[in-house]
Amino acid sequence: MTTLSPEAFAGHTPMMQQYLRIKADHPDTLVFYRMGDFYELFFEDAEKAARLLDLTLTQRGASAGTPIKMAGVPHHAVEQYLAKLVKMGESVAICEQIGDPATSKGPVERKVVRVVTPGTLTDAALLSDKNDVYLLAMCTGHNKRGVAVNIGLAWLNLASGALRLAEIEPDQLAAALERIRPAEILTPDGATDAIPAGAGASKRVPAWHFDIASGTQRLCDQLDVASLDGFGAHSLTSACGAAGALLLYAAATQGQQLRHVRSLKVENETEYIGLDPATRRNLELTETLRGTESPTLYSLLDTCCTTMGSRLLRHWLHHPPRASVAAQSRQQAIGALLDAPANASLDALRSALRQIADVERITGRLALLSARPRDLSSLRDTFAALPALRERIGAIVANADALARVDAALAPPAECLDLLTSAIAPEPAAMVRDGGVIARGYDAELDELRDISENCGQFLIDLEARERARTGIANLRVEYNKVHGFYIEVTRGQTDKVPDDYRRRQTLKNAERYITPELKTFEDKALSAQERALARERALYDSVLQALLPFIPECQRVASAPAELDLLAAFAERARALDWVAPTFTDEIGIEIEQGRHPVVEAQVEQFIANDCRFGTERKLLLITGPNMGGKSTFMRQTALIALMAYVGSYVPAKSACFGPIDRIFTRIGAADDLAGGRSTFMVEMTEAAAILNDATPQSLVLMDEIGRGTSTFDGLALAWAIARHLLAHNACYTLFATHYFELTQLPAEFPQAANVHLSAVEHGHGIVFLHAVNEGPANQSYGLQVAQLAGVPAPVIRAARKHLAYLEQQSASQHTPQLDLFSAPPAAVDDLECADAPALPDTPHPALEKLRDIDPDDLKPREALDLLYELRTLVRSHDADGHA
């Protein structure tokens, strides 16, 4: 806590002194300071918030001679403003009134109850349903010479309580951050580690927070264990230091202990198939190259019925296990779901899954005592639905170990369900302050207060009838006004019949008003019944939250089971709908895909041409040639995606598929520069190629697309040749190598493990038809000029290119210079006639002729014929203006 000198408060009002003390403890955070129905921001915070949120900046009064700049947001809409700020990477301290304004002397007592940061979100309104939010801390380990030897990572999903550790090599940081995708990264003050751009909001915290000894102890305390040996984390000193800082920061933002963080998983890079940032991007797993969410592999696979299943799918896609046993277990479960009997049909199961709430996140909010009434009712209804869900899969659990494990975890926590059923109303209000949250029959005092509040009118009617009968006064009335409260009114002629227990409350000209002990007691209750009922309900709700805390481990157990079942059912639905098959696995080196299809592209087109792909010990590199737009990149990507889907545990789009071990997938596809990093397109390409050449193993799958672009023709060809040779001779990995350098098709003559395949095209009519079929052997041309013509390049440019192509081919055949002279004029002998032997590039048909072919003169009326004549003239003039002959 920051301590300010008395001089800092001189001249400030008591309220502003309170604000300044709070702000001093959160200097880099926007402070939302509660004042009545608004959260106010002051001074620099107000200016910043007004700019970011488009709020009105006002100026009211002065403090210490300085005008007070203010901006505010209504408390009932605060979440939408928090969501905007967090999306911008800002953090917000929520400062609430905790004192009673009626009894406070001076400013009402206030304190920061939580700090909302990009990596510590738990509120449903601030979270994306289908994305996990991670807070990550990183701590660099050094040797005795001060050289960085590793980076310890600790990351936490606060919404679920999942905590993970890992230690990586320093050069693996970018890949790790791309895989984890943290929303917020904690680093020590003074650290020099470069965090890649776009990796997440960065936050500096004191270096002592990363102390290894205290971090290890804090981690043990959090997990309630004596040592970390049981988690395999005892030797991960850097990661333990990061975990200590992470837990300290997360607890501080919540203002309380993290009761739901009770488990730990240590991740090892050898546990998953390696996917570097370029591969995740090029394969468009969860985001397209344009930055959109669809169409991607994730968007195709995500037919999950629960948000938990959707989030688990994202995790599985970014963490494909290397061990095929995990994939086989999942595929066994998919097969069981597809073959289930009618009473356990896939459709019936998915219908039951739609009744399951987001137990994972509700449990997180419950642990932080921030669960709302409808969270608890959703939890209750989910637990009540679990027996029916178990009944759906009961008939098939014996056919799949994964389903048996899920079934066991789906057992509802009976005591927790009983408490929720008895305590929470069937359809509670959204907020406790609105009342109607606690169920009737749970608390006698609350029921009485509600009865008084709700049945006030009936009580008065009953009392009036009883008093008339008791006194014999026929016109006696029981009434109420705001000044005198409840009273019994008796006309002046009947006052002699008034019983002794009547006490005069007011005298009127023609009547007397009385109060009785019974009516006084009722009045005391009735006038404060609603207020007291709300206060009682708030206290009861808080006690229910406390009573539910011991059930958090059981709730977490239940949360994981529907997510996995939902995802397996989604995989089964996709397999059934899209005609996918179960892959097989072998310990032998090789990949065999028969009639494979690109899962995402197939869903976007009417007809997709399936292709085979085969690798083995005698066939390690496929040299792919063929025309532009012929489908080379699609074929390469589909091979990688089918392999990844198989190891994730999904069925795959193919007639059959068999995979040997795969440890990593690399891609060198597409062209993109790195202007911020000062790297050209060619430099980026070579950097990615270097990573592949240095790291690929005989079990790696490598996609190389047109390596060598961006430099001179001969330089590019030489590099492509040398890289292909190195991949064959040294890496011996599975390689798909697409190229337009036809000279490389001679490679199989030197290396029998290389094979030529091509995607063919044929010229037809006035254009070119891409067959998209992969055939053995090399292609004979690239059809680049035909593709340019299809793209709309003007005809004069196409004709000039065709003429110059013939000249360049002639020059290349007759000269042995290291560079072709692209800018010398073709000799006069090389005219258009000499291009006759080149592949025909028919001129685009005249649009007027095309229009005339479609006309039936016998059907034209005179006016239509005249209009058509004008249209034809316009087409001719437009065509001539474009430079056509």
UniProtKB/Swiss-Prot annotation:
Q: Does the keyword Nucleotide-binding apply?
A: yes
Q: Which GO terms describe its cellular component?
A: cytosol
Which Pfam family, an example, fits this chain? MutS_V
InterPro entries, alphabetically?
A: DNA_mismatch_repair_MutS (IPR005748), DNA_mismatch_repair_MutS-lik_N (IPR007695), DNA_mismatch_repair_MutS/MSH (IPR017261), DNA_mismatch_repair_MutS_C (IPR000432), DNA_mismatch_repair_MutS_clamp (IPR007861), DNA_mismatch_repair_MutS_core (IPR007696), DNA_mismatch_repair_MutS_N (IPR016151), DNA_mismatch_repair_MutS_sf (IPR036187)
- Tell whether Nucleotide-binding is among the UniProt keywords: yes
Query: Which residues does ATP bind?
Result: 626-633
Its Gene Ontology molecular function terms? Answer: ATP binding; ATP-dependent DNA damage sensor activity; damaged DNA binding; mismatched DNA binding
One GO biological process term is:
mismatch repair
Q: Tell me which Gene3D superfamilies the record gives.
A: 1.10.1420.10, 6.10.140.430, DNA repair protein MutS, domain I, MutS, connector domain, P-loop containing nucleotide triphosphate hydrolases
Question: What's the superkingdom here?
Answer: Bacteria
Assigned keywords, A-Z: ATP-binding, DNA damage, DNA repair, DNA-binding, Nucleotide-binding
Q: What does this protein do?
A: This protein is involved in the repair of mismatches in DNA. It is possible that it carries out the mismatch recognition step. This protein has a weak ATPase activity.
UniProt lists the family membership as follows: Belongs to the DNA mismatch repair MutS family.
Q: Which PANTHER family match?
A: DNA MISMATCH REPAIR PROTEIN MSH1, MITOCHONDRIAL, DNA MISMATCH REPAIR PROTEIN MUTS FAMILY MEMBER
The record's listing under NCBIfam families reads:
mutS1 (TIGR01070), PRK05399.1 (NF003810)
Q: Which HAMAP family match?
A: MutS (MF_00096)
Q: What is this protein called?
A: DNA mismatch repair protein MutS
Q: Which organism is it from?
A: Burkholderia orbicola (strain AU 1054)
Source taxonomy lineage? Answer: Bacteria, Pseudomonadati, Pseudomonadota, Betaproteobacteria, Burkholderiales
